[in-house]
Amino acid sequence: IPGGLSPRDVTDPDVQEAAAFAVEKYNAGSKNDYYFKERRVVEAQSQVVSGVKYYLMMELLKTTCKKTVGRPKGYQEIQNCNLPPENQQEEITCRFEVWSRPWLPSTSLTK
């Protein structure tokens, strides 16, 4: 549907790339002392708008990896972080909008 929202498979490589970008940007902007990693993409939609806008609902888990000033971790490093014991785990559900314009190349987290 041109201009409309279309459901996307959460395992689609483009969706996974947008999710990884969202996790990195979330952690960069979060005031939490610890990194949150992707548990799963719950739902994904896309919209063609001068590029592609991905609308993602994701579950994130707080890790035991402490943030270091001036040395942000990338997505793969964050995903390799350990989790605290189950009774101490913190899970959050986030909605992200990722706007991808590969010809620029430009990707941004708009929400």
From Swiss-Prot:
InterPro entries from the UniProt entry: Cystatin_dom (IPR000010), Cystatin_sf (IPR046350), Prot_inh_cystat_CS (IPR018073)
Chain span(s) of sequence motif Secondary area of contact: 47-51
Keyword Transferase: no
Subcellular location as annotated: Secreted
Site (Reactive site) residue list: 3
S-S bonds: 65-81
Classification via SMART domains: CY
Any one Gene Ontology cellular component term annotated for this protein: extracellular exosome
The keyword Transferase belongs to this UniProt entry's keyword annotation: no
GO MF annotations, alphabetized: cysteine-type endopeptidase inhibitor activity
Expressed in which tissues: Expressed by the venom gland.
Primary localization class, coarse: secreted
Residue ranges of every copy of the Cystatin domain listed in the record: 3-103
Keyword annotations: Disulfide bond, Protease inhibitor, Secreted, Thiol protease inhibitor
Function: Inhibits various C1 cysteine proteases including cathepsin L, papain and cathepsin B. This protein has no toxic activity and its function in the venom is unknown. It may play a role as housekeeping or regulatory protein.
Family, as annotated: Belongs to the cystatin family.
Protein name according to UniProt: Cystatin
Biological source species: Bitis arietans
